């Protein structure tokens, strides 16, 4: 197995269905801009379980983004579970993106869930500084950085029979927005969009979008919904 970031120069094709039959596959290369995704588990690709049910699988919103695109761009998802703005770079994942970047490409950057676990990666110190460095390096390649706020968790506090939404990622989301304004970088406010819907639906109804027993990681329903926030 691999213990570090690596480049996989293969095309994997899955054929599913009852008694599927495939006569041939025709692949035609086209030149279109690429949207690279840099982020954590809430953005990452996941494999499906069998028998498949969209509520039973983990799904990051990055794997569903191309459902909302028209073919004029392509998506390359480099997001990985457990990564922060620091470990994504230190483990070589950002180097792989830089190696492939061309002028006119896009890089969507979404971190925060794992940064907030570390004192040196808080919203007032390492988190925005690491994002600032990434933005500068993307622009040096004549590519276009896009920031995304960390998608909200379905976390509530119950007191005296009353539920109150607990916004655990407020500071990192606001730091991301502030940096975008400072550096003139577009910001996809996934945090606010997800939080608004969670509050509108309520704790229990929102569970349809999350993996069973998990208040952070979405299932495939949630992945498609969150990708819609980004596409909007």
What would you call each of these model-derived segments?
Residues 1, 36-37, 142-143:
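Conserved long hydrophobic alpha-helices within structured protein cores
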Residues 2-6:
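Beta-sandwich interaction modules
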Residues 10-79, 94-107:
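Serine-esterase "nucleophile elbow" of acetyl-processing enzymes
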Residues 43, 88, 210:
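Short clusters of hydrophobic/aromatic residues that line enzyme substrate/ligand-binding pockets
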Residues 44-46, 85, 117:
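Short substrate-entry loop that stabilizes the transition state in hydrolases
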Residues 56-59, 88-91, 125:
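Conserved phosphate-coordination/catalytic loops
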Residues 64, 92-224, 228-232:
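Alpha-helical cap/lid subdomain in secreted, periplasmic
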Residues 77-87:
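Functional beta-strand-loop-alpha-helix junction segments that form "active/interaction loops"
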């Amino acid at each position: 197995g691999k213990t570090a970031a690596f480049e996989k120069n293969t095309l994997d094709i899955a054929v599913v269905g009852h008694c599927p039959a495939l006569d041939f596959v025709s692949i035609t290369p086209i030149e279109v801009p690429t949207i690279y995704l840099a982020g954590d588990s809430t953005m990452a690709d996941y494999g499906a379980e069998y028998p498949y049910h969209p509520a039973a699988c983990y799904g990051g919103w990055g794997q569903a983004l191309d459902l909302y695109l028209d073919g004029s761009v392509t998506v390359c998802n480099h997001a990985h579970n457990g990564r922060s703005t620091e470990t994504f770079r230190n483990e070589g994942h950002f180097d792989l993106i830089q190696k492939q970047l061309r002028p006119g490409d896009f890089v969507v950057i979404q971190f925060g869930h794992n940064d907030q676990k570390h004192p040196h990666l808080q919203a007032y110190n390492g988190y925005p500084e690491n994002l600032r460095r990434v933005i500068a390096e993307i622009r040096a390649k004549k590519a276009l950085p896009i920031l995304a706020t960390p998608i909200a968790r379905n976390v509530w506090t119950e007191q005296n029979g009353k539920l109150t939404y607990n916004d655990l990622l407020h500071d990192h989301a606001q730091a991301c927005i502030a940096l975008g304004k400072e550096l003139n970088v577009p910001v996809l406010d996934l945090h606010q969009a997800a939080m608004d819907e969670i509050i509108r639906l309520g704790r229990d109804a929102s569970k349809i979008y999350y993996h069973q027993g998990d208040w952070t990681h979405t299932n495939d329903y949630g992945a498609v919904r969150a990708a819609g926030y980004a596409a909007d």
